Amino acid sequence: MGDCNISTSDNKQNRKNHEIRVPRVRVIGSDGEMVGVLSRDEALAMAEKEGLDLVEIQPQADPPVCKVMNFGKFKFEQQKKANEAKKKTKQVEIKELKFRPVTDEGDYQIKLRNMRRFLEEGDKVKINIRFRGREMSHQELGRQMATRIEMDLGDDVVIESRPRLEGRQMVMMVAPRKKS
């Protein structure tokens, strides 16, 4: 049970120094030059002599490839690359705004301003126009509201789905126009 703390090698965790349990490793020196296949102890001694760590780079290779480097700096660089990749990917969210056929002008302007902000941030907006009671017999008011929203947003948006009736509400989806 003494070897319970052996770290398994997935892409997120690189083994270093005494965590490496294979007898022979292919070593790359701190200058990037291929040193060759050495025993684990020889490779560790070489790394300690330079005051650096022995880090397992490719555990699936035969024998595993290890590099003599500063492990802290290596982890920092990996974290930096991961953060850059994460920054470049933007998750598109769907924001939802609810209207009524009789929404007052002030409320309408606030919702329109919020909708523009969501679209500028790159999010899609789902517009719900909810009908209550006898309003269902006046669906043209909902269509007029949808047309008004479309006109007020102008050419900044793409209408992904035209207004359609789903139960007691009219639904419409808009997305920001791609800037070229």
Curated annotation (Swiss-Prot):
The keyword DNA-binding does not apply. Gene3D superfamilies: Translation initiation factor 3 (IF-3), C-terminal domain, Translation initiation factor 3 (IF-3), N-terminal domain. Its main location: cytoplasm. GO terms for molecular function: ribosome binding; translation initiation factor activity. Monomer. PANTHER family: TRANSLATION INITIATION FACTOR IF-3, TRANSLATION INITIATION FACTOR IF-3, MITOCHONDRIAL. IF-3 binds to the 30S ribosomal subunit and shifts the equilibrium between 70S ribosomes and their 50S and 30S subunits in favor of the free subunits, thus enhancing the availability of 30S subunits on which protein synthesis initiation begins. This is Translation initiation factor IF-3. The gene is infC.
